[in-house]
A protein has these predicted regions:
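Structural motif corresponding to the early beta-alpha repeats
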Residues: 32, 36-127, 228, 232-242
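Active-site-proximal loop/turn and secondary-structure-junction residues that shape catalytic pockets
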Residues: 9-11, 38-40, 66-69, 104-108, ...
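Short Pro/Gly-enriched beta-strand edge/turn motifs at strand-loop
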Residues: 30-31, 142
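Active-site acidic/histidine proton-transfer and metal-coordination neighborhood
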Residues: 75-169, 179, 251-259
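Arginine residue identity/basic-tract feature
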Residues: 25, 48, 58-59, 70, ...
């Protein structure tokens, strides 16, 4: 299994200078993949990133970002959001990422109550609004369910399978699975054939393995369903105001951000 790390462990938003400083260290520690968030188009140059990663033997994964104002359901910003997602696919093609991963349905933090019929209508609208995005590229859209505090639309694998068009894949993130799924390994098996990307962290969003999560069962289920993509550490720094507020990171989650990555990598290699 290829192992990766998201640049959010250290910084946000990503810039060309940040990537030039981080990527050699990530490669030196032994990661296979570096995960690149596209917060705003133009934050970093994908062609420049592609050359840098190729020189270091690193692969890329790309994550989409859904701040307030990016929505595909019950919103007047659907067209702009579709344009943004298509841009993320173009970026992914340039850097060689097979997926764009993230909650491609609603702004993170946007929650509202829905009756069963209202939820069904929201899912139908989502399917319709994702079609032109999925049709845009061979890059696979990997949609991520989030926990109940960050969205009310897609919290579980079961909901995602109901809501999403067949051609959309899933991103599974241990942080959210641990909150919303009664049995994360069973959720993996339920998602068999649809899992396009996996993000990992400790259950406190810190270092993988320094928690009580049943890692052997989870990784065993991924093997059982023949998941072939990477496991990418996604965590966040408390030292960046934007990201600390967005992800509710109010204190350091490891002795250092480097330790979070290096110790997490060492643990993941044991699985």
């Amino acid at each position: 299994v290829n192992l990766g790390v998201n640049t959010w462990v250290w910084t946000s938003p990503l810039t060309d200078g940040d990537l030039e400083a981080l990527a050699p260290r990530v490669a030196g520690w032994g990661f296979d993949v570096i995960e690149l968030p596209v917060e705003q188009p133009g934050d970093w140059d994908p062609a420049r990133a592609a050359d840098l990663l190729a020189s270091l033997g690193l692969r890329a994964s790309v994550v989409l970002v859904m701040p307030p104002g990016r929505d595909l359901v019950a919103s007047d910003t659907v067209r702009e959001t579709q344009d943004y997602l298509r841009h993320c696919m173009d970026v992914a093609e340039i850097v060689g990422s097979p997926v764009i991963a993230g909650p491609a349905y609603s702004a993170v933090g946007r929650t509202w109550r829905m009756s069963a019929s209202e939820r069904a209508a929201a899912y139908a609208e989502l399917r319709q609004n994702l079609k032109s995005v999925i049709d845009h590229s061979e890059v696979r859209l990997a949609v991520e369910p989030l926990n109940r505090y960050e969205t009310s639309l897609l919290n579980t694998v079961e909901q995602a399978l109901e809501a999403l068009p067949e051609r959309a894949g899933l991103t599974l993130d241990i942080y959210h699975l641990n909150i919303e799924e009664k049995d994360p390994a069973a959720a993996v098996r339920l998602a068999a054939g649809r899992i396009a990307h996996v993000q990992v962290c400790g259950t406190d969003r810190g270092t993988p393995g320094q928690d009580r999560f049943d890692w052997p069962a989870f990784v065993g289920a991924l093997r059982e369903v023949s998941y072939g993509g990477p496991l990418v550490i996604e965590s966040f720094t408390a030292h960046n105001q934007t990201i600390a507020t967005a992800a509710s990171i109010w204190r350091p989650l490891a002795p250092s951000q480097d330790a979070l990555a290096v110790d997490g990598l060492a643990f993941l290699r044991t699985l």
